[in-house]
Regions:
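Beta-strand->loop->alpha-helix junctions that form or flank phosphate-binding loops
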Residues: 28-31, 248-249, 267-276, 293-296, ...
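Solvent-exposed alpha-helices and their adjacent loops that cap or buttress functional pockets
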Residues: 29-31, 39-43, 123, 138-143, ...
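Short, acidic (Asp/Glu-rich) active-site segment that either coordinates a divalent metal cofactor
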Residues: 173-234
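Acidic, Ser/Thr/Pro-rich beta/coil linker or hinge segments at domain junctions
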Residues: 2-3, 7, 11, 316-361
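Active-site-proximal betaalpha loop/short-helix elements
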Residues: 104-106, 221-297
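Helix N-cap motif at beta-to-alpha junctions
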Residues: 304-310
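Glycine-rich phosphate/pyrophosphate-binding loop regions near the starts of catalytic domains
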Residues: 5-189, 194-195
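Short, ordered loop/turn segments at secondary-structure junctions
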Residues: 99-102, 134-136, 192-193, 249-251, ...
Length: 361
């Protein structure tokens, strides 16, 4: 199989169809496009949980680098952020994390300390407690593997965690812990697509890009990681009555749109020209022969709502760029409109980051 998430048909056939045991306490569980699971054990606050894992590819000697991480796809802080983003897309704010590290035999203690130092720095920023985990050395792995399990509580209507049963929690039988996309709803996207992948490309191809573009463009793109949190827009969206949310990440915006629609059994009509792109992403993707619509898009939140203009206005009032890009339809067709051209959206493919990495090997 190709590197990255398994194809959707494999996920459905060999993973989801094998899950047969159901419990009433699990009010939102495994499924296509689900960002997190939600549990309800009592009439009090429901518990949100999700898991993120990554193979870490440190560059050079960890002892010399200290906590300076350089990975083609992820850092310890980004791993924590991705977990928090998934919970936010489900309607919850992360409050605790469990971290598991599986490390090769040659790992030095300085490596572990550097990982935990950066992870703790991100958790401090997010007001998240590292509540436990496991650190194990194994000769079964060649590269460090990290797994983060995040735990969260529902956003309150003021954007803060709620201290009791919430309307959000009561709706979690539907998609994304908020609700199912419904016919006629507006599809809204926050910030810009391809941010995460653009930052990686800018760092990994700096010399090549500098032969073509000014340094300020490449440097700005490399700093796009500052946009990766979707917690602010998710909190604002909950206050504004959003119906469904999905965190765009691996597979790009096309993958996120497909998963949101597939999980709810609805169709979409999306205007390609309205999908928000930074000029840095356009230029760098052209130079690197990458499709920006299928590129890592962490930092971009896909939402559906009855009142698209109202949600956009609410987000923009908080300084968060947002735009209406399409509509939810009553068919299973996911259509991309580009002026006079109409085509059907493909099932999610291997993310462009993994594709170009494989081609260069």
């Amino acid at each position: 199989m190709k590197i990255g998430k398994v194809p959707e048909n494999v996920l459905k056939r060999s993973v989801l169809r094998q899950i047969k045991t159901k419990r009433k306490e699990v009010i939102s569980g495994a499924g296509v496009g689900e960002d997190c699971a939600i549990f309800s054990f009592t009439d009090n606050m429901p518990l949100f949980t999700c898991m993120q894992e990554a193979v870490l590819w440190p560059d050079g000697d960890t002892a010399e680098r200290g906590s300076s991480w350089d990975s083609p796809a992820i850092t310890p802080g980004q791993l924590i952020q991705k977990c928090a983003n998934n919970l936010a897309a489900g309607g919850g704010r992360m409050i605790a994390a469990m971290i598991t590290l599986l490390l090769p035999e040659e790992t030095e203690e300085t490596y572990i300390k550097a990982f935990m130092s950066e992870a703790e720095a991100k958790c401090t920023e997010l007001k998240v407690q590292i509540a436990g985990g496991q650190t194990r050395i194994s000769n079964a792995v060649r590269m460090p593997v990290a797994s983060v399990t995040g735990y969260g509580v529902p956003f309150e209507k003021n954007g803060e965690p709620r201290a009791g049963r919430s309307a959000v929690g009561q709706q979690t039988v539907n998609k994304c812990g908020i609700g199912k996309p419904r016919l006629g709803q507006d599809v809204v996207i926050s910030k810009w697509i391809g941010l995460e992948g653009t930052a990686i490309l800018a760092k990994k191809n700096r010399e090549k890009l500098l032969d073509r573009y000014p340094a300020y463009l490449v440097d700005e793109a490399a700093c796009f990681e500052r946009f990766l949190s979707v917690i602010p827009e998710a909190a604002t969206a909950v206050k504004s009555g959003v119906c469904a949310m999905h965190d765009a990440s691996e597979g790009g915006v096309f993958g996120a749109l497909w998963e949101l629609a597939e999980g709810a059994g609805v169709g979409l009509t999306i205007d390609l020209k309205k999908l928000p792109l930074r000029q840095e992403t356009v230029e760098i993707c052209e130079c690197c022969n990458v499709n920006p619509y299928e590129l890592l898009s962490g930092g971009c939140l896909v939402m559906t709502t009855e009142d698209g203009p109202g949600l956009v206005a609410a987000l923009e009032s908080e300084g968060i760029p947002a735009v209406i890009v399409g509509k939810v339809t009553d068919s299973n067709d996911r259509i991309i409109v580009n002026e006079d051209e109409v085509r059907y959206m493909d099932r999610p493919k291997q993310d462009e980051i993994y594709r170009i990495s494989a081609e260069r090997q």
